[in-house]
């Protein structure tokens, strides 16, 4: 290579040597924003525009003639995928003068449709331009008879209004709210200070509301929170704290035993609460969870363990009887299965108090499942026994069973809430075939925890992983989510593919099999 005579190698090595064919000089000029004679300068208040709905076959050189008629261009960049290099159908444009950007926006935004596109071109300030300088206001509690001109007259004394739009329903009637956009942040702030809560419009239920409009990111977060709330993510009743319910049930029933042992009779309200304890747990979707004994022994000392073939009937106290739990297809109660696939053998399933009306005494029959399938403890007290005779039995339940319930309760609660740092071990766990999703265009700030929270509404997420650049420790904006069944994965694809977060739309699709050339 050193023997070449045209100087190409020397020019490439030394980065500036003159070449006889001018090749190096030609390359160096293609990357400059303009020729050496005229380097463009932009105003300090120049606006960076986002251009959307442009054909993917048009490059910078093809778009320049369209925008140059409104003023001198400082920078025009077509956005391309950093992984695939493909055209994204949008661009960023910065004029040297602010007025040129405003003219281009007025003339082109949703006014012209480029060849091959179904929607008109979008020309508006980029998010980064408005993030630090909010100018758009939300106005609420307006009179529904007011039109745009009335709203303009109300706000025009505080500055120049660029946009004024009243929100209307499908029938065309006003919703009593509007958006007002000023040319500067200071004008918008002045309108808020002067008008917010200052008066009550005719027909409005409260005073005028004037505040900055939500950003795209805030609206996206609110939509996700609403969706999560509807799906029950943040509702403790949907997390199936069966063990926690069993722990509370143990404590309440131990208190009932103590009150019966001391007074011999329960108040009607306490008796009714005891009778409905199991029924409320059933209708709330909180069946008692199976408990594992904390010690090696399966029964407390001095108590025999006869076999019981079925789960006892609901509580009956002072004549109040709880509703029986529902059974599907005539299945036996002892073999019932809940949605989490666990057999319902709850701690302290039944406490029965019988009042002997003839002798005026008190009989207590008590059954307690102790976490062993089909094995329960049965102990009975005759009506001749004194209240103090129940103390050993009471101590057995109060001192052993409530502590047996607590570890499993704590374990289920800790598993139900997603833990941010170590949600997944170092290695990505995968679900069955057809249950693993590839997610692209994630926000830069999303981690494993946020990714899991976003997909929890669609089913049981067994793992979530956002890939991070090892050198910079920054997110690569893509990751994987694994469900335990294909139905949840398909539901997530249908709902989240194309879901917009900020300026990007999520790409959600099934992960390719391991034998494929690429994982996505």
Swiss-Prot record:
Read off the InterPro entries from this record: CELF3/4/5/6_RRM1, Nucleotide-bd_a/b_plait_sf, RBD_domain_sf, RRM_dom
Give coiled-coil spans as residue ranges.
none
Q: Does the keyword Transmembrane helix apply?
A: no
Main subcellular localisation: nucleus
Record-level GO BP terms: mRNA splice site recognition; positive regulation of mRNA splicing, via spliceosome; regulation of alternative mRNA splicing, via spliceosome
Keywords attached to this entry: Cytoplasm, mRNA processing, Nucleus, Repeat, RNA-binding
One annotated Gene Ontology cellular component of this protein: ribonucleoprotein complex
Q: Which Pfam families match?
A: RRM_1
Subcellular localization(s) per the UniProt record = Nucleus; Cytoplasm
State the Gene Ontology terms under molecular function. mRNA binding
Question: Which intervals hold domain RRM?
Answer: 47-128, 135-215, 435-513
Function of the molecule: RNA-binding protein that may be implicated in the regulation of pre-mRNA alternative splicing.
**Family statement:** Belongs to the CELF/BRUNOL family.
Q: What is this protein called?
A: CUGBP Elav-like family member 4
Q: Which organism is it from?
A: Danio rerio
């Amino acid at each position: 290579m050193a023997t070449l005579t045209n100087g190409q190698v020397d020019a490439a090595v030394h980065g500036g040597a003159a070449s006889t064919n001018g090749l190096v000089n030609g390359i160096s000029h293609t990357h400059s924003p303009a020729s050496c004679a005229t380097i463009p300068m932009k105003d300090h208040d120049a606006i960076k525009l986002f251009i959307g709905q442009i054909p993917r076959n048009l490059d910078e050189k093809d778009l320049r003639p369209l925008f140059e008629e409104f003023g001198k261009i400082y920078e025009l960049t077509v956005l391309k995928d950093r992984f695939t290099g493909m055209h994204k159908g949008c661009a960023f444009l910065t004029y040297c003068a602010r007025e040129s950007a405003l003219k281009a926006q007025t003339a082109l935004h949703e006014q012209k449709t480029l060849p091959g596109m179904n929607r008109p071109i979008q020309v508006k300030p980029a998010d980064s331009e408005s993030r630090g300088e909010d100018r758009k206001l939300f106005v609420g509690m307006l009179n529904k008879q007011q039109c745009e001109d009335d709203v303009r007259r109300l706000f025009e004394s505080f500055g120049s209004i660029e946009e004024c739009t009243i929100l209307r329903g499908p029938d065309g009637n006003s919703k009593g709210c509007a958006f007002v956009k000023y040319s500067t942040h200071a004008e918008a702030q002045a309108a808020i200070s002067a008008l917010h809560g200052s008066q009550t419009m005719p027909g409005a239920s409260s005073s005028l509301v004037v505040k900055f409009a939500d950003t795209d990111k805030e609206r996206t977060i609110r939509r996700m929170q609403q969706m999560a709330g509807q799906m029950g993510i943040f509702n403790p009743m949907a997390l199936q704290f069966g063990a926690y319910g069993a722990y509370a049930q143990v404590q309440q029933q131990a208190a009932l035993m103590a009150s019966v042992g001391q007074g011999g009779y329960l108040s009607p309200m306490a008796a009714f609460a005891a009778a409905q304890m199991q029924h409320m747990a059933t209708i709330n979707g909180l069946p008692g969870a199976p408990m594992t004994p904390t010690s090696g022994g399966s029964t407390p000392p001095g108590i025999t363990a006869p076999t019981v073939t079925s789960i006892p009937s609901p509580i009956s106290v002072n004549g109040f009887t709880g509703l029986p739990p529902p059974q599907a297809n005539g299945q036996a109660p002892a073999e019932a299965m809940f949605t989490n696939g666990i057999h319902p053998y709850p701690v302290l399933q039944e406490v029965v108090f019988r009042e002997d009306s003839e002798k005026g005494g008190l009989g207590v029959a008590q059954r307690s499942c102790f976490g062993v399938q089909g094995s329960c403890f049965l102990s009975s007290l005759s009506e001749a026994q004194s209240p103090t005779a129940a103390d050993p039995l009471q101590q057995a339940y109060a001192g052993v069973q409530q502590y047996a319930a607590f570890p499993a309760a704590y374990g289920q609660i800790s598993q139900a809430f997603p833990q941010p740092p170590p949600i997944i071990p170092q290695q990505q766990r995968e679900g069955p075939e057809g249950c693993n999703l590839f997610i692209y265009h994630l926000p830069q700030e999303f981690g494993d925890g946020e990714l899991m929270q976003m997909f929890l509404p669609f089913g049981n997420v067994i793992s979530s992983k956002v890939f991070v650049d090892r050198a910079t420790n920054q997110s690569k904006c893509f990751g994987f989510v694994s469900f335990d069944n294909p139905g949840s994965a398909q539901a997530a694809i249908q709902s989240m593919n194309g879901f917009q977060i900020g300026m990007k739309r999520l790409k959600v699709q099934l992960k390719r099999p391991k034998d494929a050339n690429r994982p996505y």
